[in-house]
Amino acid sequence: MPIRLSPSRVNHYPDAIEGFSLIEIAVVLLIISVLVSIVAIPISSQVEASRIVETRKRIELAREAIVGFAVSQGRLPCPASATSVGVSSYCVSGTGGCAATTTLPTHGRCSDPNGFLPAVTLGISPVDAQGYAIDAWQDGADARRIRYAVSSFQSPVGTFPLTAANGIRTATMDTIAAASNHLYVCATGLAIAPSTSSCGTATTLSTQAAAVIYSLGKNGTTAYADLGFDEKNNQDVGSNDIVFTAGDPNSTYDDVVTWLSLNILFGRMVQANKLP
């Protein structure tokens, strides 16, 4: 005969809801979104920090390549211009107007003393499709190209010893070191529009930089008018501005800057028997 289940053997919870209610699902999704946002912030910061570190490595490598070039060639390379596709760009004439050329003239005048790192001339990588060295942000914008500025010291007028063939040896270290118009590097914290000839009231980090190599950082594509004075001080690409700003990243400054002092340059060339 059929077996009949007693009431004690049947489901004691006939009204139990199977699965989650909409309210419970919403609470779970809210918790997940909060956890994701908490995790995402450190990850974003880590990615940004890694890009800064990588950019610093690239800039330091570039500085070593520049020193190596100076040791082998007896001079510093001129910066690349916006149209020289990663190759050093010069002026045909040592004075007056500048007709650009990629052929080294005897006077050594650079067409863009504050231009781009000449990655093709130096043989370094990584580079963009036009041959310009790039920082670690690599979003395809021209602003991601690594910048490079070189001292335009003249002796005599119309001759640029630091970038002329064997110009450093010819001009002598004493003459070059005695000049007061090499590149300046200032500490961050500018409260007024930066000068183009000195650090003004800002702390001076160097008055004898032979070259400055730098990246405009994460916000390199931001309109210059939106940047603080510290970053504006590094924006005069193509000009004869000899003043730059360097410091740790903060809320208004994220440029990555290093420089090559005359003393280090001279020391490395002396070690290689290229000077005096």
What residue ranges belong to the model's regions?
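N-terminal leader/signal peptides at the extreme start of proteins
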Residues: 1-20, 47
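N-terminal single-pass transmembrane signal-anchor helix
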Residues: 16-46
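N-terminal pilin/flagellin-like segments and related low-complexity appendage regions
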Residues: 45-276
